[in-house]
């Protein structure tokens, strides 16, 4: 959790009333949040787990699905990567290595924009209209890699809640 706070500068969110660790169970967390009547969720996760959301995989445990390189390679191809780059991404062992390949060929930002659009699509589809939902994806090496469209708004709402709660 410390790397998350460092990567996205969230030391104010140490309050357990506003943070919940959901492990690999993104889909179940969304379903439970709707049942509990929550208004919104801002997920913050490492690229190694959250890239799977761009394929609609809502349980990110490696036993359920490991499509990390496939997702990054497809989005690289969609953003104009040549076959050598796509193969290089597919041959990577971990997302840190894949991000390095994408950064070296100048595609990291475009690929992450494309990935974030798909993450938003699947999160919104799972949440329905009952829940505002957003995600921030980071890596330990690169920091924040991408955000969905409602991430800043949900971040601000949560920050306001924490400040009001603390009487500031």
Which residues fall in each region the model found?
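Glycine- and acidic-rich phosphate- and metal-coordinating loops
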Residues: 46
């Amino acid at each position: 959790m410390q790397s998350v706070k460092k990567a996205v500068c969230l030391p104010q969110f140490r309050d357990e009333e506003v943070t919940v660790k959901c492990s690999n169970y993104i889909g179940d967390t969304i379903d439970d949040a709707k049942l509990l009547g929550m208004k919104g969720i801002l997920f913050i996760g490492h690229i190694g787990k959250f890239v799977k959301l761009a394929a609609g995989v809502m349980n990110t445990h490696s036993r359920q699905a490991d499509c990390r390189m496939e997702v990054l390679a497809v989005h690289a191809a969609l953003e104009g990567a040549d076959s050598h780059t796509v193969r290089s991404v597919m041959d990577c062992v971990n997302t840190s290595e894949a991000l390095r390949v994408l950064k070296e060929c100048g595609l990291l930002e475009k690929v992450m924009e494309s990935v974030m659009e798909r993450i938003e699509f699947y999160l919104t589809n799972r949440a329905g209209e009952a829940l505002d939902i957003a995600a921030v994806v980071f890596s330990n090496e690169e920091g924040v890699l991408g955000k969905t469209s409602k991430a800043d708004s949900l971040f601000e709402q949560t920050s306001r809640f924490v400040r009001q709660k603390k009487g500031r």
